[in-house]
């Protein structure tokens, strides 16, 4: 439980690094992680990697690279700029694959700025790879398990509710106004940006 509430200690980071070194020795192709605010467990509990410090990420990437091989892949949140990933690629001497570089209607230039930063990093001799989608990101969801909006700060009170309690919150005008306001504000990374014309009720 502590892993979803705080950063790892140096001792815990070393234990994780040992597991990664063992995996690389056994033939793993690399190490993957996420800082995406959309990645939560049950009840909105953040995935442990979302709480990891930059130092933890770097230590684990360097553990991966101990044999001179491996690719680090990260689904990055807004707090992990390309410049930081370039630094990690340089210090570990290994490629970094960055996902998911998706267009954001409230901040349309952000994904292109990331792609430009990746190109510039490669021109400086780093190996950064940006993952893009060849088709629109689509999914089915329900209001009981609303993955596209789980990363919204305004939606957090709903994540631990079920049944009548959830229905009451969803009907609360103040809750709805907070969600609308957050969706209207620009964001570096967000799965859903209030593009209601793209949402279809199927059941």
Residue spans for each PLM region:
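Conserved divalent-metal-coordinating catalytic cores
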Residues: 70
């Amino acid at each position: 439980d502590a892993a979803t509430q705080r950063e790892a200690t140096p001792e815990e980071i070393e234990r994780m690094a040992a597991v990664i070194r063992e995996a690389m020795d056994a033939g793993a192709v690399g190490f993957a992680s996420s800082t995406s605010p959309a990645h939560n467990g049950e009840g909105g509990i953040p995935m442990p990697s979302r709480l990891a410090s930059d130092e933890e990420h770097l230590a684990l990437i360097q553990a991966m690279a101990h044999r001179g091989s491996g690719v680090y892949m990260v689904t990055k949140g807004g707090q992990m700029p390309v410049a930081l990933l370039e630094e990690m690629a340089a210090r570990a001497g290994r490629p970094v694959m960055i996902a998911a570089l998706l267009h954001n209607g409230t901040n349309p230039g952000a994904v292109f700025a990331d792609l430009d930063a990746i190109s510039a990093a490669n021109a400086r001799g780093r190996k950064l790879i940006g993952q893009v989608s060849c088709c629109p990101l689509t999914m089915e969801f329900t209001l009981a398990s609303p993955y596209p909006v789980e990363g919204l700060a305004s939606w957090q009170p709903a994540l631990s509710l079920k049944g009548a309690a959830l229905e009451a919150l969803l009907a609360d005008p103040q809750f709805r106004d907070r969600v609308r306001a957050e969706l209207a504000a620009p964001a570096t990374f967000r799965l859903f940006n209030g593009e209601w014309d793209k949402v279809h009720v199927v059941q």
